[in-house]
């Protein structure tokens, strides 16, 4: 009798994706982040669902409802901090996942890569709207500043901003619609994840060498299921430690002050995971130019496959490209630091230099070094 997991209409889909899936034998721990992102999404949807049962999306009661969750709801504090810090873990895994794709040349699977970029935008939008919901000072002013950027769009900008706000300022209508979209988007993200996996399983996984691994495949279960479970345990240990020992480490103290439209905080800044893009936005003195640079800082990932001119797929055997890649990582850390600093000397010039370097490395230096390495291969 044939095994039920191979014949049942639903089970055979799961079987072909997670059990009998042929996987390259050389996958390193850098390939763990896809499954870790799945766990993060599950944690966020579950904790978010329970938080939504107690949260009220009204400007008069939103801040108090979050306080009520923390003080009066059984384990409400745990749910709230798991959700807030879960977002940070989500972005850590997300950036490492994208970094892995850049380093090992996974972007040559263009459909999977493009769906991944779409997922990145969707998760960023979800996180931004979620940050507005507690209705603290940074929530309110963050929402005001970031949505106001759309007014830089010629001709329709002002109308577009007022349409998003649902009025002439960030108010009750804005909060209600942000809550609705923040609840809806994770399910759209989950659907996009399915499409992401569908395209990935069409081509099979890349591997650290960048060389086709068809002659050397192993079943996903038990080898990579065990490896993934170890990854889950490490990540959940890190998340639990953050939540239980220093839950406010990555947050902003200003968000414990109720939103006040009449009092602007001295330094308006988004959550840490958006600071690199915020630094790029601020480094350009023109509003429209800043907005374009902000969008391009993420959208630039879409042209990376076009800029790949190397004869080798992975950077594993390309030391010059490796140096450039780690310089790019250093630039991103610098931008993240600058995004959290006030707009004054010397931070302005450091931010502008780092922003120029960011685009220069990806658009010009990476392809140039790849061509140099191609030339060196002939020697």
Swiss-Prot record:
GO molecular function, one term: metal ion binding
Family: Belongs to the cytochrome b family.
Domain of life of the source: Eukaryota
Cofactor binding comment, as recorded: Binds 2 heme b groups non-covalently.
Cofactor(s), by name: heme b
Membrane topology according to the record: Multi-pass membrane protein
Gene Ontology, cellular component aspect: mitochondrial inner membrane; respiratory chain complex III
Other information: Heme 1 (or BL or b562) is low-potential and absorbs at about 562 nm, and heme 2 (or BH or b566) is high-potential and absorbs at about 566 nm.
Record localization: Mitochondrion inner membrane
Binding site for a ubiquinone: 201
SUPFAM superfamilies, per database record: a domain/subunit of cytochrome bc1 complex (Ubiquinol-cytochrome c reductase) (SSF81648), Transmembrane di-heme cytochromes (SSF81342)
Keywords noted in UniProt: Electron transport, Heme, Iron, Membrane, Metal-binding, Mitochondrion, Mitochondrion inner membrane, Respiratory chain, Transmembrane, Transmembrane helix, Transport, Ubiquinone
UniProt cross-references to CDD domains, sorted A to Z: cytochrome_b_C, Cytochrome_b_N
InterPro entries, per database record: Cyt_b/b6_C, Cyt_b/b6_C_sf, Cyt_b/b6_N, Cytb/b6-like_sf, Cytochrome_b, Cytochrome_b_C_euk/bac, Cytochrome_b_N_euk/bac, Di-haem_cyt_TM
Record's protein name: Cytochrome b
Transmembrane segments: 33-53, 77-98, 113-133, 178-198, 226-246, 288-308, 320-340, 347-367
Residues bound to heme b b566: 97, 196
Keyword Plastid tagged: no
Positions bound to heme b b562: 83, 182
Pfam families: Cytochrom_B_C, Cytochrome_B
Main location per the UniProt record: mitochondrion
């Amino acid at each position: 009798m044939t095994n039920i997991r191979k014949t049942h209409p639903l089970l055979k889909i799961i079987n072909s994706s997670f059990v009998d899936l042929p996987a390259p034998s050389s996958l390193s721990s850098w390939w763990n982040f896809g499954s870790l992102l799945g766990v993060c999404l599950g944690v966020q949807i579950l904790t978010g669902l329970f938080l939504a049962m107690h949260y009220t999306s009204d400007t008069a009661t939103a801040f108090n409802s979050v306080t009520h969750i923390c003080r009066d709801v059984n384990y409400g504090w745990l749910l709230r901090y798991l959700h807030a810090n879960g977002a940070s873990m989500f972005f850590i895994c997300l950036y490492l996942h994208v970094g892995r794709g850049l380093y090992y040349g996974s972007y040559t699977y263009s459909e999977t890569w493009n769906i991944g970029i779409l997922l990145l935008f969707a998760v960023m939008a979800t996180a931004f709207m979620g940050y507005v919901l507690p209705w603290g000072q940074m929530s309110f002013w963050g929402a005001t500043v970031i949505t106001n950027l759309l007014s830089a769009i010629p001709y329709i900008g002002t109308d577009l901003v007022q349409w998003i706000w649902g009025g002439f300022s960030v108010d009750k209508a804005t909060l209600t619609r942000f809550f609705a979209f923040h609840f809806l988007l994770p399910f759209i993200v989950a659907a996009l994840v399915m499409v992401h996996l569908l395209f990935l399983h069409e081509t099979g996984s890349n591997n650290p060498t960048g060389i086709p691994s068809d002659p050397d495949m192993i079943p996903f279960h038990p080898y990579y299921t065990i490896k993934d479970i170890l990854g889950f345990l490490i990540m959940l240990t890190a998340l639990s430690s953050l939540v239980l020992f220093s839950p406010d480490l990555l947050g902003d103290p200003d968000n414990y002050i109720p939103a006040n439209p009449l009092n602007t905080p001295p330094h308006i800044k988004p959550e840490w995971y958006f600071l690199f893009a915020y630094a790029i936005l601020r480094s350009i003195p023109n509003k429209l130019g800043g907005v374009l640079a902000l969008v391009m800082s993420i959208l630039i990932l879409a042209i990376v496959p076009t800029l790949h001119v190397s004869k080798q797929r992975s950077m594993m055997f390309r030391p010059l490209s490796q140096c450039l890649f780690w310089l790019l990582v250093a630039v991103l850390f610098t931008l993240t630091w600058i995004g959290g600093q006030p707009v004054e000397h010397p931070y302005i010039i450091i931010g502008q230099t780092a922003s120029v370097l960011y685009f220069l490395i990806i658009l010009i230096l990476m392809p140039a070094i790849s061509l140099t390495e191609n030339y060196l291969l002939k020697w």
